[in-house]
Regions:
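Residues forming the flavin
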Residues: 1-58, 62-153, 157-174, 178-535
């Protein structure tokens, strides 16, 4: 017999086996589980921290085996087959959605051909270093584009609340298979870190090639190849090698679009082919707020010393719109995530140790389609696709941020000065590289966004006393939390509603947010492709 139980410990009791066993036995009695002298074997499943009160508690969950031995491994089996030549599937994008789609295809021996505009991890790391130290941006290989997608060099956070979308444990298990620490299988908020994730992505890509798949780096998808009989159908893609300039046509049985939230050219490509395949969706924009780590730790841990950096999650409703923290990076860094030279875009990341001197989070507010100014709707309509209005507006805000910056030095303002609407004569030390420049965010950010952020920060300070302080720094602008465009797909077949054999997938298509949910969507879409090919 087996059952699952939860116990509560103090941090000092976490490694006290006698205390743990006593609490487990007590929980079994409380749940009226009959053990009758049988051997009890607990297997640890998950840990989370409850820091809501002054006395911090650890919530530990166990699977308890009563009178039987634990299973050797109750994780999913990974059965990959070498690709056959019978079927081929093109995957545009090598982020988590694309990679996990590829591994799902290997379960049926189907060959994936991955098209990736950016560099493999080692060269991509060089591109990123040049951006941070010299301010030089490679528009196709950066924090957003390249091997492993945006998450490879921007945090490696795996936590998702979208567990109903797929088997998240299988997602974690595959990461562990390629070198991720096993604790991601049990942590409540699993995190790999940008110092470890590139090696894991390398191992994944090596396996894809070993199994007979292909990965084409530095290769841009420039167009779909379509044919029309009864309906429009995608049969391949046109590509361009960004190093040699060579153009090529690649044909396949199906195409999975897993391009991420920053591939504006893909939306514009689809708008030319079939504008009704796109729809506008709600997204969010705002700023990064960065504190010295010790301030957040003191607030969240009530002055107690803990080995890890503290996290937080904040939400508010202001003027009928949500304002919330996103991608909180304890012990992390703020990083530049623009994909064009005339943009400033920021994001956050942490290494596996989460041990920098700062903690940061995006603070963003909803931007619904009806919030987009009419001039952008008119521009998108004139260009044949009204659904792109939010994308045009987002680009405008990123350009506006650049115009209030100094090259890749991001505009910044102390949080207290933002609330008081005054100049920041000095700025606190920051993790952001290349650097920051003092700017009146309160003057040039769109008024509705500024007002909502100001009101939300005051509300957040009620929940986290000391959140508003002179050392807190706002860095603009955070605009890539999600895409403003959705590529429409059928709820059952997951095929694009307007273009047959085209399968929108992941964050860039509007169906996920973050590594975990994107990987699950990749598996889900690949399963739909497999079902289609079996018919």
């Amino acid at each position: 017999m087996t059952c699952e139980i939860s116990i509560t410990l103090t941090p000092d009791e976490e490694n006290d086996d006698a205390k743990i066993n006593a609490e487990i036995k007590k929980a079994l009695v409380q749940q009226k589980v009959e053990t009758s002298g049988q051997k009890i074997t607990p297997v640890f499943i998950k840990k989370s921290i409850d820091a809501r009160r002054s006395q911090i508690k650890l919530l530990m969950r166990y699977k308890v085996y009563i009178g039987e031995e634990p299973e050797d491994d109750f994780s999913p089996s990974l059965n990959w087959k070498h690709a056959e030549n019978k079927h081929k599937v093109i995957i545009v994008g090598s982020g988590p959605a694309g990679l996990y789609a590829a591994f799902r295809l290997f379960e049926e021996g189907i060959k994936p051909i991955i098209i990736e505009r950016g560099n493999p991890t080692k060269l991509r790391a060089k591109n990123i270093k040049e951006l941070e130290t010299e301010g030089f941006l490679d528009e196709d290989s950066n924090f957003c584009f390249g091997s492993g997608g945006a998450g490879t060099f921007s945090d490696g956070k795996l936590y998702t609340r979208s567990n109903k979308r797929g088997d998240i444990y299988k997602i974690y298990k595959i990461f562990v298979e390629f070198g991720a620490p096993p604790n991601i299988l049990t942590d409540a908020h699993p995190h790999i870190g940008t110092d470890k994730l590139p090696e894991i992505i390398d191992a994944m890509e090596k396996k894809i090639v070993e199994l007979g798949g292909e990965i084409h780096f530095n290769t841009l998808c420039t167009d779909l190849i379509t044919e029309k009989k009864d309906s429009l159908k995608a049969v391949g893609v046109k590509t361009k090698n960004l190093e040699t300039g060579k153009e090529e046509e690649i044909f396949a049985d199906a195409i999975i679009l897993a391009t991420g939230h920053s591939a504006e050219d893909i939306y514009k490509m689809l708008a030319k082919i079939e504008p009704s395949a796109l729809e506008a969706k709600t997204f969010a924009v705002g700023v990064r707020v960065e504190h010295p780590r010790n301030i957040i730790d003191d607030i969240q841990f009530h002055g107690q010393q803990m080995p890890q950096a503290a996290e937080y999650r904040l939400t508010a409703q202001i003027e009928g719109r949500g304002v919330y923290s996103f991608c909180m990076c304890p012990g992390g860094y703020v990083v530049p995530c623009a994909t064009k030279k005339d943009q400033i875009v920021v994001n956050g990341m942490s290494s596996s140790g989460r041990n920098s001197n700062w903690s940061n989070a995006a603070i963003v507010t909803e931007r619904r389609p009806e919030d987009i100014p009419q001039s952008f709707v008119d521009e998108a309509t004139a260009n044949g696709c009204p659904a792109l209005a939010g994308l045009y507006w987002r680009t405008w805000l990123e350009n506006l941020t650049f115009n209030n910056a100094n090259g890749q030095f991001a505009p910044a303002q102390r949080l207290t000065d933002f609330l008081n609407e005054t100049d920041s004569k000095t700025l606190p030390e920051t993790s952001y590289r290349p650097g920051v420049v003092s700017s009146r965010l309160d003057k040039w950010l769109p008024k509705d966004i500024k007002n909502r952020l100001q009101a939300a920060f005051k509300e957040f300070n009620h929940n986290m006393k000391g959140f508003i302080c002179d050392e807190a720094l706002l860095i603009a602008s955070e605009t890539r939390t999600s895409t403003p465009v959705r590529i429409l797909r059928d709820k059952q077949t997951l095929e694009c509603t307007k273009i047959k054999s085209l399968y929108p997938c992941g964050e860039g298509s509007g169906y996920s947010g973050g590594i975990g949910s994107s990987a699950m969507d990749g598996e889900k879409v690949a399963s739909a492709v497999i079902n289609s090919l079996k018919k």
